[in-house]
């Protein structure tokens, strides 16, 4: 009697139909446009699909084949990654709604809009689930590419991986460095340069140590006879430090026996991604901060994951930890929020070895932290630094309050108005609130507000949270929608000196005409690169933030020891982004996530191989 196989029987047909429907949702999700083009539901859907039938058909077939293959090739291991895929699918839909501040999108405006949202949610959840399962399988199986042992370049890499990789990256950056002459900076650095020149007093809103270093660069320029040369020397020093850290990171990944594909891909990203090759030429406090965070991750990987004999007590380890911590604490005001949790987790990691081991582990990071506080105090005294605004620390609650005031202005009792007005200018909040950046709201912070006023304000903040939690959630989500969005291009470029006319004339900073022309061609080349497949993803904070969550889930499920310490830098960076002022066109806040995730992935690879052995 002929038997009906599971693949060709009724259940096989049902499974195949579901697989095809899911593949169609995945394909449609990639091309979904949430703009409502017509009030007619059929026309609205037709406008979204029109002209895309061929790519939709191709992607549907490809996804259907992948899904059928994944059923046997990539088994599900627990529910963690599935839940994460669903959450990321929902986040993707909301991110597409909130990612653009220039167009208003309503998901519930019509039945067709709601259908678009459902299709996109189902499709992206399935796409994320497929990607997560594939990555999970690659990590657990130890899938890698094999490279031949011969060749002069291969032998040089084995002998000097840090030197070779650092030199290669620096060579790739050379065109960007030349075109950036004499200097490129953002508005924050321009303000620091004006402080270093003495045009305005030093203030604590920007790290005073970084301002002092910029002053040294200007002093070097005076010695060399040109401010251009002094500022360009700073750029060169930053590029050399960056290449050295990246080379060292590649050597660390090799020590962890990271797969070839991970090392090669991360090196390519370091060489050609804007967060590296473009920003390494920019005087930007986030660049030395992120490079220092990368160096700290290297040291944590070698001491905690690789556990090289005697390395944790070596002088080289202590020096590199000190350089990393000082770089994080002196160039960014929030560096302490990363170093302290890392020190705490490091101490807890060795708690079974006794209190001496705990003190020794903590001292690696806490001693440089104390030294940085002494240095900052000295700089503050030497340059008479004006205290920064305390309101800088409350970006998120201020933003939530502003949205609540805009939404419920007439319903707020007089007593609550007065309490808010003691901290922020209540009457201005409704008009100046910008859902994507908290700076306009923070500018109304009253400098004379003390602890008493802030305590009363947070009491009102808590009451309003209970009154309309959705309002607070919207304020948080809109401002941080891009944090887990791998599709939207959210990259800022700083190509010009950015100085005020007064500062530029005083310094004599100028850019040759030929470099302006080359910069124009460089901008055209960027557009070409962003048109390449996967380039946007590999250069976006959202992609690496999602990868961070995947690594967290897998490490937790597999009980990979030491990963909590390794993930401190990217996780705390993500927390600070949520609490921070803005992410739109400010990808620099996420640089530590991009810089450190390849190392975290290499560490997880090492721990999974150790468990398997």
Regions of interest found by a model, annotated:
Residues 18-34, 85-98, 158-185, 368-381:
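Transmembrane signal-anchor helices characteristic of membrane glycosylation enzymes that use polyprenol
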Residues 41-58, 229-233, 478-567:
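Membrane-interface anchor segments at the N-terminal boundary of transmembrane helices
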Residues 317-332, 343-344, 368:
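Membrane-interface alpha helices of multi-pass inner-membrane proteins
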